[in-house]
Amino acid sequence: MRLSNIEHWLTYHIRTWLSNSFEWSTIHNSTFIISLFSSISAGLFSMISVYAVPWELRLGYSSLDVNLLYAAGNLGAYLTPPLLGILSDSHGPVILSWLSFIGFVPSYLYLSCVFQLGSDPCFALSVVAFAIVGIATSSLYFCALITCAKLYPDTKLLSISFPTTCFGLSSVIGLQVIKLPWFHSKEDGYLDLAVVFKSFAVFYTFVFLLTWISTSTISIIKLRGSQSPSASHASARADAIVLEDETTLLLASGNKGEFYKRIRNFFQDYIAYAFLIVMLLSMGVMEMFNTNMVNLTSLILGPGSSFNVLTQFALFSTSSRLLSGLFIDLFTKWNWPRIPLIILMLLSAILAQVIIIHAMNVVNISYIAIASAISGFTYGGLFTIFPALTLNLWGDEVFGTAYGTFMLGPAFGSSFFGVMYAQVHDSNCKSVIPAATADPVTSSPNCIVPAFTASTIALVVALTITIIATVKSKRLRSA
């Protein structure tokens, strides 16, 4: 496979250095390790909820301001993957590495300066900065995911499950790191976002240097004409690749035609649209639960209740990513279809919604804990199984475009179900503080039941679409 002009010039010097300095096995293994580290780094955006209190205390942000920043980041992260996928398929994951660097560093430096000033001179610029951070997050995560998929196209555990698991671990690790005293204001005690964001800018510069190296390896793989470097793992050197006449290494028109033919076939495949709808419904519901977990817990158990359900959600999500990848590989080895895993996850999600509705009539944290664990298990599993099936059905050559398109589902789904939850909550539920010393008075948790009734129906529809598509498509039954 040939390289585009952009990919050629962005990777030429790195390819030359790697080929002249290291054995192929060293390059291959190091690239995989760097990609996993990149996945962990990309997930730091999910810690955005801990910024709310410092913003409110120092910058005077209202709840609406904070939610606008959240929305900007999420839209940037979820709406751009189709374009990022096309860029990666056309010019290699190295282009995503550069985009992440260009997005992360200036944005975090600006946000750091705003927090240090103690006032926001232009809130619109902060919104734009967070939208760019969201885009950079998707760029870095896709960069890592696509690199792993190119390195190990034959094993979903290594190509999909490992990077998605690392992405899930990110918030768990990051939350522990920012507990260090260095990240907190000595005078006021709250999280000093000026220090946090500056640290992020420095950290992502270091990550960029590593990913620039790892993504250049994918260019070497293309030039070797092998989609599976493990097949030639014993190859001593890659010197000959770089010594070829560079005029023969640019993307040929024939290869372009074949690539765009694959893209057209994907967009004409009804299975792709079924996947998109299922992801919109299922991931939208899961994002709604994840976003409003603290609010829901307070509504059911009362103000001041334990929020350990957040940790349970994260841990079960991370575990599910790893287990799902393991089961996908086992199913592949045994020649079993993998679509039942999607059906299992959707059934689990429906069960979680039913438990939540039941918990609203029983003031017992056990039900919320169980629902949180099941939802986390489903959330992590779906985010692992969907890309694995995408890779299996449409191949690694258009994987970025295909899975990037599917990410539109969570983008619109999370917005729709999140707004629905907010509307039901604001219309039916009350939370007032009659006096400064009084405890908040909340209405019955049953007030939010309509939101979860609707989410349960949405999951049933997603399950029905999945079953119908499986029955109609022999290719999907054997996927």
From Swiss-Prot:
Keywords: Glycoprotein, Membrane, Transmembrane, Transmembrane helix, Transport, Vacuole. It is found in: Vacuole membrane. The chain crosses the membrane at residues 32-52, 68-88, 95-115, 127-147, 158-178, 193-213, 266-286, 309-328, 339-359, 368-388, 398-418, 448-468. Glycans are attached at N29, N295, N364. SUPFAM superfamilies: MFS general substrate transporter. Pfam families: MFS_1. GO terms for cellular component: fungal-type vacuole membrane. It is a multi-pass membrane protein. One of its GO terms (molecular function) is transmembrane transporter activity. InterPro entries: MFS, MFS_trans_sf. Probable transporter. Belongs to the major facilitator superfamily. PANTHER family: TRANSPORTER MCH1-RELATED, UNCHARACTERIZED NODULIN-LIKE PROTEIN. This is Probable transporter MCH1. It comes from Kluyveromyces lactis (strain ATCC 8585 / CBS 2359 / DSM 70799 / NBRC 1267 / NRRL Y-1140 / WM37). The gene is MCH1.
